[in-house]
């Protein structure tokens, strides 16, 4: 087992009035990305950490994948105990937690003198109201800088037409933000103030509230804020993954057609964790992350071109101009409402039944699943047959794609709505499904014939092998098949290579595999025939998933990359050397002109266990081997006895 780096993050100061946990975590995400904490365990401490509620701490911890850390932890203190009591835990359990933490040295007072090899410092008082975007959660965008960054500008107000920069989706969503009572209550109070001032949501904005817990609805009802949110269009649509994961549903057809006809720059604003290009909605060209109350404000503004701090949201009954500061609730108002409306019995009502003894026995239908050959949702998987059953030679590999930095799992295998003109859409249409039943890529992950067609299906992809006449990289789900040099849609290229049984490789830049821990981001490339990926760096979760599918992750040495090597996709590749944890291997590049270049790379199988899984062909193959060996040993013992 490779021990992770333990990094101390000292939080100093206190957040300024009006600053939400979302503002803090988006600012921290930018800071920690720059500090390169990928794969590290972070321990937050200091006076700033002590001042944060447990809900605020959880918001910070839940964004760990966005800043690349494996874990983000706060020590146990009185805030922890108060939260356990607030959320309905039994007194005996609360007492046990406190006693155990103090006895085991896990209470915050016991950890004040902890020493770390690496310490980062962050001042909470430096945080300002902020968005993140477009394209990345670590791309912080202070609202005071909207004009300077070229986001806000002249707002078009032509009757009957959407403005450029129209916010077509405004969603209070994600488990990270909606599980924080202060964030949700703040949104409700802002909605109440907006309604009292006579402000309304713009008609082209599709708004929604998708809490991470049913308890949210209970305390919004208790606070009397549900109706205020619903009046602005923020009614509860589900307690599940929705807009965050590209499942906001269809737009009004007239709005969708206007976006297409006028080629509008349409956007989404949501309180989610991720805003990668193409993730939120096919017709939202870009997405911005914001706190729940800011999401409500942007639904009223109706356009990202709006300077949310300075511009006028509307007028009240007396004709007075209303700006954000006029409807933003005070911290004291938020805290008072949380204290009066959020109650332990709400959490007990929601969660206690989950842990109750249920005796609902059902008759056994069949010892084995009855596979349906025409299903597009669940199909017998191919992981022990076909290409995955063959030997990986790591020889003569051709590049499927040459990619830049910050490639996300949404680029590798999007999860949003399936469109008719996509490879998956065409397949589902041939299977007899009407377009309204296509659903999303995520819902078809149990059918490999649909899901593998999502591989690199993101229309925002830039494959550096595919260029325009002027030499710029062409955007789209495209590939160039070698040796012909023919450009085609990515799925057709994959089919071509699969027919030829051609081993493939992917070449990429830094931070490859950011975002959701999406298994199909690894499954898709392996089923396509990809045997290795060489990049400047990998996100931890995706690297692990690649190994689990039998794909070899290789890392360029510092200072070496696709650009310094002049790679253009016409090359073929071999990998030679003994695969050991973090061993130096040799990437042999065969150029079209006959030249051969040998480049040292690091084998990113970081432990002996990862080597074992990779050599078995992946985690499923390893499981099958272990199972068969155990069965064989049990049979031998029985025979001997």
Listing of model-derived features with the role each one plays in the protein:
Residues 316-330, 542-613:
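Acidic, glycine-rich flexible loop/linker segments
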Residues 285-287, 584-641:
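Charge-patterned, long linear interaction tracts outside catalytic cores
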Residues 120-224, 228, 360-534:
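Non-catalytic terminal/interface segments that mediate subunit docking, oligomerization
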Residues 204-249, 451, 516, 522, ...:
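Extended C-terminal subregions enriched in glycine
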Residues 1-107, 185-186, 191-206, 235-349, ...:
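Mobile "lid/hinge" segments at catalytic clefts and subdomain interfaces of large enzymes
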Residues 283-291, 295, 301-304, 308-406, ...:
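Extended hydrophobic packing segments that form well-structured cores
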Residues 54-76, 135-137, 168-186, 239-244, ...:
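Conserved phosphate/anionic-ligand binding catalytic regions in large, soluble enzymes, centered on
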Residues 6-8, 39-43, 70-73, 119-121, ...:
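Structural motif
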């Amino acid at each position: 087992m490779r021990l992770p780096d333990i990094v101390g993050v000292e939080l100093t100061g206190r957040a300024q009035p009006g600053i939400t946990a979302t503002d803090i975590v988006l600012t921290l995400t930018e800071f920690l990305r720059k500090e390169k904490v990928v794969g590290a365990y972070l321990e937050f401490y200091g006076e700033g950490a002590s001042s944060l509620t447990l809900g605020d701490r959880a918001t910070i911890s839940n964004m760990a994948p966005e800043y690349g850390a494996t874990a983000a932890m706060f020590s146990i203190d009185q805030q922890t105990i108060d939260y356990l009591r607030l959320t309905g835990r039994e007194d005996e359990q609360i007492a046990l937690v406190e006693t155990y933490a103090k006895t085991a040295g896990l209470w915050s007072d016991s950890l004040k003198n902890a020493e770390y090899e690496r310490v980062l410092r962050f001042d909470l008082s430096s945080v300002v109201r902020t968005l993140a975007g477009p394209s990345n959660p670590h791309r912080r965008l202070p609202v005071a800088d909207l004009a300077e960054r070229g986001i806000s500008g002249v707002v078009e107000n032509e009757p009957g037409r959407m403005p450029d920069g129209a916010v077509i989706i405004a969603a209070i969503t994600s488990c990270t933000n909606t599980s924080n009572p202060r964030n949700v209550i703040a949104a409700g109070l802002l909605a109440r103030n907006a309604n009292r001032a006579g402000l309304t949501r713009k008609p082209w904005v599709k708004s929604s509230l998708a809490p991470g817990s049913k308890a949210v609805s209970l305390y919004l009802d208790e606070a009397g804020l549900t109706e205020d949110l619903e009046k602005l269009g923020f009614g509860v649509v589900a307690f599940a993954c929705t807009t965050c994961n590209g499942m906001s549903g269809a737009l009004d057809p007239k709005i969708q057609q206007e976006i297409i006809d006028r080629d509008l720059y349409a956007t989404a604003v949501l309180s989610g964790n991720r805003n990668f290009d193409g993730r939120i909605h096919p017709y939202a060209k870009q997405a911005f992350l914001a706190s729940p109350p800011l999401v409500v404000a942007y639904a009223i503004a109706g356009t990202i071109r709006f300077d949310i701090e300075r511009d006028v949201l509307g007028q009240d009954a007396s004709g007075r101009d209303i700006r954000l500061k006029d409807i933003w609730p005070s911290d004291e108002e938020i805290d008072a409402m949380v204290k009066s409306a959020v109650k332990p019995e709400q959490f007990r009502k929601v969660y206690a039944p989950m842990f109750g003894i249920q005796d609902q026995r059902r008759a056994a239908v069949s010892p084995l699943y009855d596979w349906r050959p025409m299903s597009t949702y669940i199909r017998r998987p191919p992981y022990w047959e076909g290409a995955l059953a063959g030997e990986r030679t790591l020889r003569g590999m051709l590049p499927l794609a040459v990619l830049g930095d910050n490639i996300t799992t949404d680029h590798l295998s999007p999860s949003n709505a399936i469109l008719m003109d996509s490879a998956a859409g065409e397949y589902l249409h041939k299977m007899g499904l009407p377009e309204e039943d296509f659903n999303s890529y995520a819902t078809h992950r149990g059918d490999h014939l649909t899901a593998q067609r999502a591989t690199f299906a993101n229309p925002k992809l830039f494959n550096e092998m595919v260029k325009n006449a002027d030499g710029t990289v062409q955007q789209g789900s495209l590939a160039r098949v070698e040796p012909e040099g023919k450009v085609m849609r990515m799925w057709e290229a994959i089919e071509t290579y699969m027919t030829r049984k051609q081993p493939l490789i992917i070449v990429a830049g830094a931070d490859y595999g950011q975002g959701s821990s999406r298994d199909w981001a690894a499954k898709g490339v392996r089923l396509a025939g990809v045997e290795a990926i060489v990049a400047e760096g990998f996100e931890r979760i995706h690297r692990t998933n690649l190994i689990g599918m039998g794909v070899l992750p290789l890392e360029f040495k510092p200072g070496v990359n696709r650009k310094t090597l002049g790679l253009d996709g016409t090359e073929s590749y071999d990998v030679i050397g003994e695969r050991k944890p973090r061993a130096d291997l040799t990437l042999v590049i065969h150029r079209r002109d006959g030249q051969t270049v040998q480049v040292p790379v690091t084998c990113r199988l970081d432990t002996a266990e990862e080597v074992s899984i990779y050599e078995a062909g992946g985690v499923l193959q390893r499981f099958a081997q272990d199972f068969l060996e155990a069965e064989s040993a049990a049979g031998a013992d029985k025979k001997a006895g």
